[in-house]
């Protein structure tokens, strides 16, 4: 499955717009990681624990979006947008949204 932030796929023609698809991931962060991330923030460092959690959330959300597109018979998802939010109690949310399309390779 091709997923792209652009509105076209190079070398292909969009033959049908199947619909809007999305995937979500809501993940908890634990107390130790929150504490260590707070220390990193105070001293100006990067929080690898949170970066890893964000990457994991992004992968899950994109995979879910692609799975939903495949269920609709799509070949690709174009115009993909990612949104990250911090929810209460240390919960992280990632949402991937795009348009599922059918493609034909250009001659």
UniProtKB/Swiss-Prot annotation:
Originating organism: Halalkalibacterium halodurans (strain ATCC BAA-125 / DSM 18197 / FERM 7344 / JCM 9153 / C-125)
**Superkingdom:** Bacteria
- Which PANTHER family does the record cross-reference, listed alphabetically? UPF0145 PROTEIN YBJQ
The name this protein goes by in its record: UPF0145 protein BH1111
Family per similarity comment: Belongs to the UPF0145 family.
Q: Name one Pfam family in it.
A: YbjQ_1
